[in-house]
Amino acid sequence: MTALLKAAEVEHYLHRHIPISAMMGVRVMACDSTGVVLRAPLAPNINHRATVFGGSASAVAILAAWAQLHFTLRQAGIAERIVIQRNQIEYLAPIPTDFEAVCPALPAEALARLLKTFHRLGRARTEMTVELRCAGQVVARFRGDYVAVRLAAGENV
């Protein structure tokens, strides 16, 4: 499977299961072992100052981290429900045009801890980080705590 096909499949999944991602124009640029990169256009996310609305920027960061964790756990053969428990975003500069949310893969030791806890308890928590970038510049930094919970028998994702 090519990376482009995989990114298209991930994008389809997000648009189908998290419809706001389609309304915001979110595109999946990459989803691989190094992380997830989402891209969002200015137009559907614009505010009264002709820059990206802070809530849109935050939503794209939340989505990038969620996608990274979801597909990492899927690759490990885990069916889960993921919720965000808390998050913080620091805006460093206005976002005047299309932007990207870059969520790196979990470090190996964090992933091992997450998987061990999940297998033992049926739930686990981890911190995810995302950088928002515009024209090569980091414009915001996001941190969020996500909780993965094992699906109940018969429950679908």
Where does each model-flagged region fall?
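Polybasic, low-complexity association/targeting segments
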Residues: M1-Y13
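Short connector loops at helix/strand junctions that flank enzyme active sites
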Residues: S21-M23, S33, A64, I82-R86, ...
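Short structured motifs
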Residues: A22-V26, Q85-E90, R113-L115
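Catalytic strand-loop segment that frames the active site of acyl-thioester-processing enzymes
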Residues: M23-V52
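Hydrophobic residues positioned within well-ordered beta-strands of beta-sheet architectures
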Residues: L38, Q85-N87, A101, T126-M128, ...
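Active-site helix/loop of acyl-thioester processing domains in fatty-acid/polyketide metabolism
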Residues: G55-A76
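Hydrophobic beta-strand-centered segment that forms part of the acyl-chain substrate-binding groove
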Residues: L69-A108
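HotDog/MaoC-like acyl-thioester-processing domains
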Residues: I95-P96, L106-V157
